[in-house]
Regions:
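Electrostatic, structured charged patches in enzyme active sites and in nucleic-acid/phosphate-binding
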Residues: 1-145
Length: 145
């Protein structure tokens, strides 16, 4: 069951949502967490991890000034039944900051697959999710008609 915490909206109208005492940045992210729990219970995946963190650029010092590392915290890491691991980020839209972090991630971690997914009741799978780029393609085609 989804418990909405104090209605805190960010600039993209996402509402923080709490499930199992875990606060998610958006309702869609919380719903995907529930989907992953269901997939694990059904034996469709082996396991999953919340918010895996990746260092995109190490911290450094220059001219006596310290610069912090640039980090990327994904939404989930999924482990399949054949021990293949991939990263999932639930996105409604891609911000400029995320596009840069995605580019840095793909450069630094070329062997780790990053899947972007969106929620779409109309076009999504049984859990209501679809590949972000596939949804963009469908929407573009539908605008053309």
């Amino acid at each position: 069951m989804i418990n909405k915490s104090t209605t805190v909206k960010n600039k993209y109208n996402n509402k923080k949502t709490t499930i199992d005492d875990i606060v998610f940045d958006s309702k869609d992210e919380a719903l995907y967490y529930q989907a992953l729990k269901d997939m694990k219970a059904k034996g469709l995946i082996k396991d999953f991890e919340l918010q895996p963190e990746f260092i995109l650029q190490e911290g450094f010092e220059k001219d006596e000034k310290k610069y912090r590392a640039i980090k990327y915290t994904a939404d989930f890491r999924v482990l399949t039944n054949n021990d293949y691991s991939y990263i999932v980020d639930v996105k409604g839209m891609l911000t400029t900051e995320f596009k840069i972090k995605m580019k840095l991630f793909n450069y630094k971690y070329p062997d780790i697959e990053l899947k972007l997914i969106s929620r779409s009741i109309k076009f999504g799978d049984e859990y209501g999710f679809i590949d972000y780029y596939e949804l963009q393609k469908i929407r573009k085609q539908n605008r053309g008609n």
